[in-house]
Amino acid sequence: MSNDRDFLGKEPLGKLLLRLAVPTVAAQLINMLYNIVDRIYIGHIPEVGALALTGVGVCMPLILIVSAFAALVGNGGAPRASIALGKGDKDEAEKILGTCFSMQILISLVLTAVLLLWNRNFLLAFGASENTIEYGVSYMNIYSVGTIFVQLTLGMNFFITAQGFAKTGMLSVLIGAISNIVLDPVLIFGFHMGVKGAALATIISQGLSCIWVLSFLFGKKTTLRIRRENMKLKRERVLPTLALGSSVFVMQSSESIIAICFNASLLKYGGDIAVGAMTILTSVMQFAMLPLQGLGQGAQPIISYNYGAGKKDRVKGAFKLLLKSSMLYAALLWIAVMLFPQLFAGMFTSDPALLDFTKTALRIYLAAMFIFGIQMACQLTFMSLGNAKASIVVAVMRKFILLIPLIFIMPAILKINQTMAVYLAEPIADILAVCFTIVLFRREFKKALSKI
């Protein structure tokens, strides 16, 4: 691929979005398998699968925090690097890249220490019971060691995609996903390691992906290269990066807080089976969210570059294509989940009681999935335009102002089935949040275009 990024400002938008989004969506589909394959295998461990799945599910708030910190730096730095490239300032773009690399390493070291020292305490606070705690601790003790691989792979891959090297970014995910899919059954069942084998497979796979990502960004084929002289942490680059990435961090870290709230409420009203079902529900949710993020990542360099280059019509056109594509995907997946919930639930468990419970919960929890496309398209466009404030407002509104209170309010209102009432909080929050986002986006998008 040519190092000339001006194709982002010249090629027809439909062809360009297809060119960039297909690899990123494929990467996210692979990433989806990467994220859920552990749970698929764990849920089918003979005799203890349901409890093991629940125990590992309680680890999700901690895993989401690790991913959130990677996204904080990656989503904060990559759009700023793209905008700098659009303005023709490659030197500044490389300084942003180097700064983000150093930030990822520093954050990963701190997270590793915290997770190794206090994961049991966290898991007990997050909804683990005496039946599931040992499965969670066994998983996290091993997963914590590979935190640096997760940080660098997830966080720095944004910079590969942001330069237009979507296929290279996809390969980084593909390497890890294939490795994980192959290693999981070998370590879980072949070596009888159970959840420890799942965790070990994950960190080995992330390590291989990390090698691929860094070899590219330190190599000669990339437009922006990590250089030693650009690794210094300077206030003028660190703070804007954190500001822009904070919206995604709020979204992902709030998912951790939400998972804790869901687990606590579900454990109270439904016990271990309700918490186990939640693990499956959030896994199925990734079928929607990760491909939608892939579409947004494909559109991000187009929107950011053309915004930096002052090409208003191309910015508007790219957003419209992103919105239509996102809405179509979300609607089709919603239909599939509503018609065949047992198919999705059966991927993660063969336990009859858990399977029957999850089928009902799935239809309730994902009842508003068809509007996810609107929320994600607007959210990712805010970030592509460098609008940190609007992104934060949208994230805070949906998660903190709407969803978390509803998790506790709904079972108090619908006492006939308090467990299912907890799940109902999700679609109600989704609908209200999308209405708010549409109003805010129309105002902020118009304001951003007026500055070009």
Residue locations for each model-derived region?
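Short alpha-helical transmembrane segments in multi-pass integral membrane proteins
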Residues: 1-24, 81-148, 190-245, 303-368, ...
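N-terminal transmembrane alpha-helices
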Residues: 8-48, 61-76, 80, 105-112, ...
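Transmembrane helical elements of multi-pass membrane transporters/channels
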Residues: 19-38, 142, 176, 205-209, ...
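Hydrophobic/aromatic residues in alpha-helical transmembrane segments
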Residues: 22, 38, 77, 118-119, ...
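Helix-terminus/linker motif at the lipid-water interface of multi-pass membrane proteins
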Residues: 29, 33-54, 123-130, 186-193, ...
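Small-residue hotspots at the loop-to-helix junctions and early N-terminal turns
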Residues: 50-61, 136, 140, 199, ...
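Small-residue-rich hydrophobic transmembrane alpha-helices
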Residues: 53-113, 150-169, 277-341, 372-391
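Short runs within selected transmembrane alpha-helices of multi-pass transporters and secretion channels
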Residues: 74, 143-161, 172-177, 198-211, ...
